[in-house]
A protein has these predicted regions:
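Bacterial N-terminal signal peptides that target proteins for export
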Residues: 1-7
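Surface-exposed beta-loop interaction hotspot
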Residues: 151-200
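N-terminus-biased targeting/localization segments
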Residues: 8-13
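C-terminal motif of bacterial Sec signal peptides marking the signal peptidase cleavage site
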Residues: 15-18
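Bacterial signal peptide processing site
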Residues: 20-22
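Acidic, serine/threonine-rich low-complexity disordered tracts
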Residues: 24-155, 194-302
Length: 302
């Protein structure tokens, strides 16, 4: 190979590597900037969610567990809160170090034979930018033991999981950022028409992961939406999991959740459903005196 040919080859290699690095850099930038669009909250949204009250909604629950339908209660609590990014906890008061989030506390209570189940999940979604949830937690308690799972949104999804089951025990892992089933509920309350539809990867509901003892990872799924008069249905169907989630909500603001269904390929034979009973707007954290116990009757929780 003569000197001219060698120089030409080296130059082509440098150009090729430069183009490749440039392309990779652009992809990284695009990925880093994906979903960082500022949220343009409407005046109606702010008047509703920034009024110092929460929405507490109770649901009649039919939960499938161990192949049988169990009667129970579900509660969805949506509230706007100040959030500390570094500590990733609710702040005692808003400050220059906080930003607003929409928090969902979702609970389920039902019994399996002699012993009770209690499930609670919390999802914190920013109200400043259209990004992923900043934190998700999930816990289950029953007489055999308890589990706890937490995701912190850092440079990646940092997940810690603890379980009394053999083979699960204590786990710590890092996942690439992708859509979380848990965060979809908040997104549907903020702006249901901005949900990304079509085939995509999702991390399933944390309580589903724990109850079904499946690996903590993203699974291929398809998200669809269908409007029927005054109701919007959002459907999540997982390709390699026997799971379909249908969420029904009002098309009118504040887009309240009317019911949801969790189905399998067996249809009605393995069918979880929660249907709205009552919905209240109140500062529930100030209602912890026995004199406010009647509010549980109002929510039909007793």
């Amino acid at each position: 190979m003569n000197n001219l040919t060698l120089v030409t080859v080296l130059m082509l290699g440098i150009v090729s590597l430069s183009c490749q690095n440039s392309t990779e850099t652009e992809i990284e930038k695009a990925t880093a900037n994906e979903g960082t669009k500022a949220l343009d909250l409407s005046k109606e949204f702010k008047q509703h969610w920034f009024d110092g009250r929460a929405e507490v909604a109770s649901y009649n629950l039919k939960q499938m567990r161990y192949g049988e339908a169990r009667e129970g209660k579900a509660v969805l609590i949506f509230v706007k809160e100040p959030f500390l990014q570094d500590e990733q906890v609710k702040a005692n008061a808003a400050s220059s170090q906080t930003f607003d989030v929409l928090k969902l506390n979702a609970t389920k209570k039902f019994t399996t034979g002699i012993y009770p189940y209690s499930i609670m999940q919390s999802t914190f979604s920013p109200l400043t930018t259209n990004t992923h949830a900043v934190k998700v937690t999930a816990s289950t308690q029953e007489w055999c033991g308890q589990t706890y799972m937490q995701m912190n949104n850092r440079d990646a999804f940092k997940i810690a999981s603890h379980s009394y089951f053999e083979g699960e025990a204590d786990q710590s892992l890092s996942l690439n950022k992708t859509l979380l089933e848990n965060e979809i509920w908040n997104k549907l309350r903020i702006n249901p028409t901005e949900i990304k539809t079509g085939p995509q990867k999702l991390i399933p509901d944390f309580s589903f992961i724990r109850l079904q003892h499946i690996p903590v990872k993203a699974y291929q799924a398809e998200v669809q939406q269908q409007k029927n008069q005054d109701t919007l249905m959002t459907k999540i169907a997982y390709k390699n999991l026997d799971r379909i989630l249908n969420i029904y909500q009002s098309t009118a603001f504040p887009f309240e959740i009317l019911k949801w269904e969790e189905k399998t390929s067996e249809g009605d034979k393995n069918f979880t459903q929660a249907v709205l009973q009552k919905r209240l707007r109140l500062d529930y954290w100030n209602k912890n005196s026995n004199t406010f116990a009647f509010l549980r009757d109002s929510l039909q929780l007793n």
